[in-house]
């Protein structure tokens, strides 16, 4: 079974994290959630996730993909040298890096969106050197980006397809009566 890791910190966007987790699990992927703070993480609307894995124990070699949900505290992730190093490790290994809403700004500021097709929360779009698309989800090579909380399901299916293939994504869509 392919494995995905997700990073949370306080202020994460609940629907982006939990919705993506649920779709990936329905698609047969193993998903481990890590707390940047090595403790419980509370989302922007008060949902607290417990029993999270400590970020300090995350080993990139164990995973096929990295998922970065958005939320108002995305800058905490961006300011972490350890998170930046993890993203670089995944990118350089050609593994899937997926970020939604505010999450893609971490990739953009680090230069990973240069020459790439991408999306992100509209008001957070800067000149990242790539081609911005006003779509719910955009995949370009090993980078998957999502626009906003409303785009969570489309984003999650794009991640599932990038990791497990189109057949698995289509089967999972059918199982939940997704368009």
Regions found by a protein language model. Give the residues of each.
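Short, glycine-/small-residue-rich phosphate/pyrophosphate-handling segment
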Residues: 100-136
């Amino acid at each position: 079974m392919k494995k995905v890791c997700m990073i949370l910190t306080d202020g994460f966007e609940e629907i982006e994290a939990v919705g993506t987790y649920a779709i990936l699990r329905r698609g047969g992927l193993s998903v481990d959630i890590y707390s940047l703070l090595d403790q419980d993480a509370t989302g922007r609307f008060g949902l607290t996730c417990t029993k999270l894995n400590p970020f300090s124990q995350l080993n990139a070699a164990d995973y096929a993909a990295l998922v970065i949900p958005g939320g108002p505290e995305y800058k905490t992730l961006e300011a972490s040298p350890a998170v930046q190093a993890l993203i670089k490790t995944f990118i350089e290994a050609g593994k899937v890096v997926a970020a939604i809403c505010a999450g893609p700004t971490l990739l953009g500021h680090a230069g990973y969106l240069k020459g790439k097709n991408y999306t992100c929360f509209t008001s957070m779009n800067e000149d990242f050197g790539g081609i911005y698309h006003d779509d719910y989800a955009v995949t370009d090579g090993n980078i998957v980006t999502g626009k906003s909380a409303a785009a969570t399901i489309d984003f999650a299916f794009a991640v599932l397809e990038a990791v497990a293939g189109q057949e698995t994504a289509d089967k999972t869509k059918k199982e939940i009566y997704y368009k």
